[in-house]
Curated annotation (Swiss-Prot):
<comment type="similarity">
    <text>Belongs to the GatB/GatE family. GatB subfamily.</text>
</comment>
<dbReference type="InterPro" id="IPR014746">
    <property type="entry name" value="Gln_synth/guanido_kin_cat_dom"/>
</dbReference>
<keyword id="KW-0436">Ligase</keyword>
<dbReference type="InterPro" id="IPR003789">
    <property type="entry name" value="Asn/Gln_tRNA_amidoTrase-B-like"/>
</dbReference>
<keyword id="KW-0547">Nucleotide-binding</keyword>
<dbReference type="InterPro" id="IPR023168">
    <property type="entry name" value="GatB_Yqey_C_2"/>
</dbReference>
<dbReference type="Pfam" id="PF02637">
    <property type="entry name" value="GatB_Yqey"/>
</dbReference>
<dbReference type="InterPro" id="IPR006075">
    <property type="entry name" value="Asn/Gln-tRNA_Trfase_suB/E_cat"/>
</dbReference>
<dbReference type="InterPro" id="IPR017959">
    <property type="entry name" value="Asn/Gln-tRNA_amidoTrfase_suB/E"/>
</dbReference>
<keyword id="KW-0067">ATP-binding</keyword>
<dbReference type="InterPro" id="IPR042114">
    <property type="entry name" value="GatB_C_1"/>
</dbReference>
<dbReference type="InterPro" id="IPR004413">
    <property type="entry name" value="GatB"/>
</dbReference>
<protein>
    <recommendedName>
        <fullName>Aspartyl/glutamyl-tRNA(Asn/Gln) amidotransferase subunit B</fullName>
        <ecNumber>6.3.5.-</ecNumber>
    </recommendedName>
</protein>
<dbReference type="GO" id="GO:0050567">
    <property type="term" value="F:glutaminyl-tRNA synthase (glutamine-hydrolyzing) activity"/>
</dbReference>
<dbReference type="GO" id="GO:0050566">
    <property type="term" value="F:asparaginyl-tRNA synthase (glutamine-hydrolyzing) activity"/>
</dbReference>
<dbReference type="GO" id="GO:0006412">
    <property type="term" value="P:translation"/>
</dbReference>
<dbReference type="Pfam" id="PF02934">
    <property type="entry name" value="GatB_N"/>
</dbReference>
Length: 475
């Protein structure tokens, strides 16, 4: 029996508003526990919520960027459940009239493009955060009432790799709109995954498992891979899959049962009586649409068409708005686009990944990188020497020209000076000359290495190769 995997994702994104969705409480991350709450957040008797218009604008902006249809009439509903981090015993969410529906994004996996549908995007308030210790449980209500959008995908993904690509693309689009920073480590982007298997050709979905505790895109993929293998083994051995909620354990790299679901959750939704229905007219929609900046796909296409970048470079550079904006500023300052791309995708990304930092955390600036790239273009420094300059720039900042002068790193491009060095190296390595003339190409590499060593890496490589071949041919 051949089985097909069905995956759908539910993504919660915290909106970057200055105040909460139904109160004036601040939304700053990292504040002392329970210092950013109000009587509205905590559900005191007699208090009334007031809808934050900016949260609605942000939700519409995200929905439009995800190609959703925007509702003309929408409303809020009470989702009833009891849990310690939910002080009102209900959550204000949206049930049957979400703000956005029928959207899609396009992903690419192994060179193949695929459209993933988005069922709905709705607004809701976040719950508090529980922390469990050996002595008991603690609740921080700072997060209670934070504005969220929940983005529910269609079950269109067939592999964990597609799920990873979907999340990467979704995060990129949301970041470009500016409505959220999408930092998983701070909880401003969270994901639950639903996965089931069915025989190939069968239309009815199999019994799904819901995966939680997915703290990174990599863990989403790994959790889905494990669950895919677990369900496949169970089904092929004649077993049945129960509807379960499971969590991904980072230590064992397995999914672990949290609870078995005997039926669907009954949250007893009913319209929120303290908030009127919201009417979104065409003028409001168009005002929000006009505020949407250039999105990653459009920027990627522009890099290929106008700057002549390879599609791969354009894809990597536009994955995050921070990297793309940095690239644009560097090129606008006069640097060559392809050379800038090479440095950002190579040395810069390698440094950031190793140090677990973002561009905003380092001393490197677009102006600094641009000057360094232009020094390479002019032949003032070689790419090898540029790495020494780069290390200084990203750690301490500064002016590349001043760094080159202070460290004596100017590339030697004087032909007379280099010819003298080349002649001296050849005089001391006659065997290498013979080897090269006898067809041993590696001998030329040895000679170039000796020349670079003698000049402390400052010789102009193309000029060295030219002079070296000329001098060998004379002998």
């Amino acid at each position: 029996m051949n089985l097909e995997t069905i995956i759908g994702l539910e993504v919660h994104v915290e909106l970057k508003t200055n105040s909460k969705i139904f109160s004036a409480s601040p939304t700053e991350f990292g504040a002392e526990p329970n210092t950013q709450t109000s009587v509205i957040d905590l559900g005191y008797p007699g208090v009334l919520p007031t809808l934050n218009k900016e949260a609605v604008n942000f939700a519409m902006k995200a929905a439009m960027a995800l190609n959703c249809e925007i509702a003309t009439e929408t409303k809020f509903d009470r989702k009833n459940y009891f849990y310690p981090d939910n002080p009102k015993a209900y959550q204000i969410s949206q049930f049957d009239k979400p703000i956005g529906e029928n959207g899609w994004i396009e992903i690419e996996v192994d060179g193949k493009k695929k459209r993933i549908g988005i069922t709905r995007l709705h607004l809701e308030e976040d719950a508090g955060k529980s922390t469990h210790t050996a002595d008991g449980s603690l609740v921080d209500y700072n997060r209670q009432g934070m504005p969220l959008i929940e983005i529910v995908s269609e079950p269109d993904m067939r592999t964990p790799e597609e799920a990873y690509a979907y999340l990467e693309k979704l995060k990129s689009i949301i970041q470009y709109t500016g409505v959220s920073d999408c930092k998983m480590e701070e909880g401003s982007l969270r994901c639950d995954a639903n996965i089931s298997l069915r025989p190939v050709g069968q239309e009815k979905f199999g019994t799904k498992a819901e995966l939680k505790n997915l703290n990174s895109f990599t863990y989403v993929q790994k959790g889905l891979e494990f669950e895919q293998a677990r369900q496949e083994k169970e089904l092929l051995s004649g077993g049945i899959i129960q509807q379960e909620t499971r969590r991904y354990d980072e230590a064992t790299k397995k999914t672990i049962l949290m609870r078995v679901k005997e039926g669907s959750d009954d949250y007893r939704y009913f319209p929120e009586p303290d908030l009127v229905e919201l009417y979104i007219d065409d003028e409001w929609k168009e005002a929000v649409r006009a505020s949407i900046p250039e999105l990653p796909d459009a920027r990627k296409a522009r890099y290929v068409a106008e700057l002549g970048l390879p599609a791969y470079d354009a894809h990597v550079l536009t994955l995050t708005k921070e990297m793309s904006d940095f690239f644009e500023a560097t090129v606008a300052d006069g640097a060559d686009a392809k050379l800038t791309s090479n440095w950002l995708m190579g040395e810069v990304l390698a440094y950031l990944n190793k140090q677990q930092k973002e561009l905003k955390d380092v001393a490197l600036t677009p102006a600094g990188l641009s000057k360094m790239v232009q020094l390479i273009e002019k032949g003032t420094i070689s790419s090898k020497i540029a790495k020494k300059v780069f290390n200084e720039l990203i750690e301490k900042g500064g002016d590349p020209e001043e760094i080159v002068k202070a460290k004596g790193l100017v590339q030697i491009s004087d032909e007379g000076t280099l010819r003298k060095v080349v002649t001296e190296i050849l005089d001391n390595n006659e065997q290498s000359i013979e080897d090269f003339k006898n067809g041993k190409d590696r001998a030329i590499g040895f000679l170039v290495g000796q020349i670079m060593k003698a000049t402390k890496g400052q010789a102009n490589p193309p000029l060295v190769n030219k002079i070296l071949l000329e001098e060998i041919n004379k002998r």
